[in-house]
Amino acid sequence: MGNSSRRIFIKSAAMTGIMASFADSVFALEGSSNLHATGEKDNYLESIKQELVKQWPKNRTINLVFHGHSVPSGFFKTPDVRTLQSYPHLLLKELKQIYPYAVINTILTCIGGENAAQGAKRFKRDVLNHKPDVLFIDYALNDRRIGLDASRESWEYMIKAALKKNIKVILLTATPDQKVDLNDKATDLQKLCDQITGLANQYKIGLVDSYAAFQQRISAGGVLSDYMSQVNHPNEKGHQLVADGIMKYF
């Protein structure tokens, strides 16, 4: 091989190496983006977890705001409200076990019987004023009254308003209604849950698929009524299932 041919070969090999390295870098970036896009439980709340481990005087109050209907409000068998057995406070109890130095507020802005359209109307006044560090939205169960389109519009409004304030957002799919077949994929409730899952993916935010968690538990041999206090409200055992799903982010 002559000197000229040798130089061409070396340059070609070098360019091949550069392109391969570039391709690897692009693939790595795409992989990183995909991890973030799915609201990965291991890292979505990383900045919040870093705050939760700080000790006085470096720590600050962390506000967890729960916006939704009667379930996060703590309604069991209406009109009985069992605040300390509902998932926001079961979550707080578990968080304090692993973050003993943290000051954590669980703030309820829920109203029993409310749907997402109603919740969106008071969102700025009743939710954003609490300056949430993490916002949980749980309206699917009651959104059957307003339909998919109105529900989506309302959820998107709240999501966008929260993200504009750099708030971490975690969406929750529905807890069960015993009048609805959990295994029927064509129900209005399942369609709403699917839409919520799509919104979480679209906006790269967190998702707790409570509906799927109940489906899996029942498919494994559980009895749905064992998790319910009335036809459409979970009992403490059902609330614990939701709290367990949220805890995976912490």
Model-derived regions: residue spans:
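Internal alpha/beta domain cores that form substrate/cofactor-binding pockets in large enzymes
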Residues: 63-65, 102-130, 143-169
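Structural beta-sheet core signal
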Residues: 66, 137, 171-172
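Extracytoplasmic/secreted envelope proteins and their assembly/folding machinery
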Residues: 88, 92, 120, 152-159, ...
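A short acidic, helix-capping loop that chelates divalent metal ions and anchors anionic groups
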Residues: 73-77, 117, 143-146, 178-182
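Cell-envelope and extracellular/periplasmic
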Residues: 71, 79, 108-114, 136-144, ...
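Serine-esterase "nucleophile elbow" of acetyl-processing enzymes
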Residues: 35-109, 122-131
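Catalytic His-Asp segment of secreted/periplasmic serine-dependent ester chemistry enzymes
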Residues: 175-250
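N-terminal export signals
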Residues: 2, 8-31
